[in-house]
């Protein structure tokens, strides 16, 4: 009975203990994404800004923004028309981590994102734009490495895949930094 109460108390305190041990993390990443619409693909600059809360040493939740911001991918549609495409994505999901060494950790994350995709047909006169939005899945895998400059600062590298609306997909590679609070 006492062992059961002790274990229950330990599990109840663990999220609070983890939160007080620098388990609030912020990240900023930059890289490139390959946007593909099934007819053509193009690479474009992408950025990610996010927040993670760890409810255990190896599991956490992610919230953030990922998108092409002002950059546009130059693609072709099914009729051969030149189109320019960009997207904004607000995501939420789960993160799982596995330490490899004292200084390096591998991680995987996944969840769902509300995505807004904008297509502009630049072959048309005048140009026509359409916007498509919806909730779509994403998955990512990456590594983070301690910097040695600051115990709360880490460098990251990540590969992500995200389904977008209207048959589009995004495959990204990014590098960045994470800061623990």
For the regions a protein language model found, what residue spans apply to each?
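Cleavable N-terminal export/targeting peptides
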Residues: 1-23
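Short glycine/proline- and aromatic-enriched beta-strand/turn motifs that initiate or cap beta-hairpins
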Residues: 15-61, 65-74, 96
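Residues that define the transmembrane beta-barrel architecture of outer-membrane proteins
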Residues: 22-24, 43-47, 86-90, 133-139, ...
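Repeated loop/turn-to-beta-strand initiation elements of outer-membrane beta-barrel proteins
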Residues: 24-28, 57-63, 102-106, 147-157
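Membrane-embedded beta-strands of outer-membrane beta-barrel proteins
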Residues: 28, 49, 92-94, 110, ...
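Transmembrane beta-strands of outer-membrane beta-barrel pores
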Residues: 30-36, 45, 65-71, 98, ...
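Outer-membrane beta-barrel translocator domains and adjoining extracellular loop/strand segments
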Residues: 37-45, 71-80, 118-127, 167-173
């Amino acid at each position: 009975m006492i062992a059961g109460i002790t274990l229950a108390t330990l599990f109840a305190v663990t999220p609070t203990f983890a939160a007080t041990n620098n388990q609030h993390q912020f990240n900023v990443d930059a890289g490139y994404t390959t946007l593909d619409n099934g007819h053509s693909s193009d690479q474009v600059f992408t950025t990610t800004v996010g927040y993670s809360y760890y409810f255990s040493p190896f599991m956490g939740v992610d919230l953030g923004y990922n998108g092409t911001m002002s950059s546009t991918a130059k693609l072709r549609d099914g009729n051969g028309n030149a189109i320019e495409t960009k997207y904004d994505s607000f995501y939420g999901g789960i993160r799982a981590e596995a330490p490899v060494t004292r200084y390096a950790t591998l991680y995987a994350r996944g969840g769902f994102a509300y995505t807004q995709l904008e297509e502009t047909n630049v072959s048309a006169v005048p140009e026509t734009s359409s916007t498509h939005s919806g909730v779509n899945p994403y998955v990512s895998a990456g590594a983070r490495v301690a910097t040695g400059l600051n115990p709360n600062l880490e460098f990251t590298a990540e590969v992500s895949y995200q389904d977008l609306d209207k048959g589009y997909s995004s495959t990204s590679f990014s590098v960045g930094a994470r800061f623990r609070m």
